[in-house]
Amino acid sequence: LGMITMEGHHDGKRPAWISVDSRVIGRQDDSIANYKAPLENPLRIVLSGNLSHDLGIYMRTPGNDLELITGLLYNEGIINGHEDIISTEIDGEVATVLLRDVNPQSITPNDRPFLVTGSCGVCGRGELHDHKMVDSEETVSQHRLHEYHNTARNHQRLFYHTGGTHGATAFDVNGFMISSMEDVGRHNAM
């Protein structure tokens, strides 16, 4: 049917989804319906520092790229914290990250696909990076858990419009929402 328009703004700057006029075929008749699909764009991540390495191309919802890069590098065991990143320069769809030190063992070409699609992020990995266990006596009531869920859903604008994104929301021990983000494929959208 051919009608595609860009709408919404995920990060306040770029379109968040496209609207497509679609033909819906039923048993008795067909009709025209408007479908909203979240955008997914490539981002190539290149590391520089004592070791240069192309991590690959990551498919993601545009926006929040610094958070994606920092979380990815931490979860992959390449950095120990955000202080290991000296600078990040994003030029179009290429991000160059200058690191203090790159651990060569954390970057092995055999367990990294060149193109990372919007799947769960674990598929195809040889091993998972170990994280410290949370050491806390804090508990959350069932009622508060439901409140957190409702608050998180209210901040998932892309999901509300498209039904096609993952969301992640963090709260502190007092119930204050720290952050909430969405993405097509990042389960750890923050």
Residue positions per predicted region:
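Feature captures the catalytic cores and cofactor-binding loops of soluble hydro-lyases/lyases
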Residues: 187-190
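Intrinsically disordered, low-complexity regions enriched in acidic/Ser/Thr/Pro/Gln residues
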Residues: 4-168, 173, 179
